[in-house]
Structure formats: structure tokens, C-alpha cells
């Protein structure tokens, strides 16, 4: 298997992780479960999509903030993705941080629910971009 095919497989894996995270967020939301958990899954859905993009970039980071900054600088500010998606990713990160690390911070449905739709659009747009850039169709990959 070539390096390009391995990159495509990893990108597809990251996009699958993104889709699963958003499915989990939807399940938790409709089930009336913890909004902290919903926000966490929304953020990770978007984060995994960004990791799929970074497979094709000369960049690595051990910090989420670095990944987000790179996405905003190289994908949003360059015009490849709309500013609204950059804002949605930043909002998801902020809510996940607050929900996971602040002891007395409570998320509301009004904060979290709209972000679920934005996250779905985010992942769809990343997939479309990668499909156009490298042709991620699974049937084109060889063993």
C-alpha cells in the first residue's frame, strides 16, 4: 500500500471518528443526557475532522489549541473554509473546556443544541474538501 493510500485510510478513519462522535452527541441530546457530554462529543467530532485535514499538512501539535490555531490560520483565514466554521470550532472548544474543567459551570440546551447542527456542517464540509483534494472515495483504495 502506498503512502498516499495510507494517508487516505487514516483520513477516512478520522472522518469516521468524527461521524461517530456526532452520532453520540445526537443520541445524548435526544436522550436528555448530560449537556457536558454532548458538548464533549460535538467538539471531538469537529476535532477529528480537523485531524483528517492535518494528515495532508506539514504540521503536528500535541495541543488542541495548536491544532485549532493552525486550522484557523491555514484553512479559515486563507478562505478555504468560511469564518462561521472557524467560529463554530472555537465555540465547541470553549464549551468543551468549560464543561470538562470548570466545577460550577452548567451548559444550557440553548448553548449546545445549535452547535450540533454546525458541527454536522463542519464535518460535511471537511469531507467534501478532502474528497475534492485527494479523492477519499473508499472504493478507490487498494489493500
Regions found by a protein language model. Give the residues of each.
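Terminal alpha-helical segments
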Residues: 1-143
Amino acid at each position: 500500500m502506498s503512502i498516499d493510500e495510507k494517508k487516505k485510510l487514516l483520513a477516512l478513519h478520522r472522518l469516521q471518528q468524527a461521524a461517530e462522535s456526532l452520532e453520540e452527541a445526537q443520541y445524548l441530546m435526544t436522550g436528555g443526557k448530560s449537556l457536558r457530554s454532548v458538548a464533549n462529543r460535538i467538539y471531538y467530532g469537529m476535532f477529528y475532522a480537523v485531524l483528517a485535514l492535518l494528515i495532508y499538512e506539514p504540521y503536528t501539535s500535541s495541543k488542541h489549541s495548536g491544532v485549532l490555531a493552525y486550522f484557523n490560520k491555514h484553512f479559515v483565514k486563507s478562505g478555504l473554509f468560511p469564518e462561521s466554521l472557524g467560529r463554530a470550532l472555537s465555540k465547541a472548544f470553549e464549551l468543551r473546556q468549560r464543561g470538562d474543567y470548570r466545577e460550577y459551570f452548567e451548559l444550557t440546551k440553548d448553548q449546545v443544541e445549535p452547535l450540533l447542527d454546525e458541527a454536522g456542517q463542519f464535518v460535511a464540509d471537511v469531507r467534501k474538501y478532502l474528497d475534492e483534494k485527494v479523492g477519499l472515495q473508499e472504493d478507490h483504495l487498494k489493500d
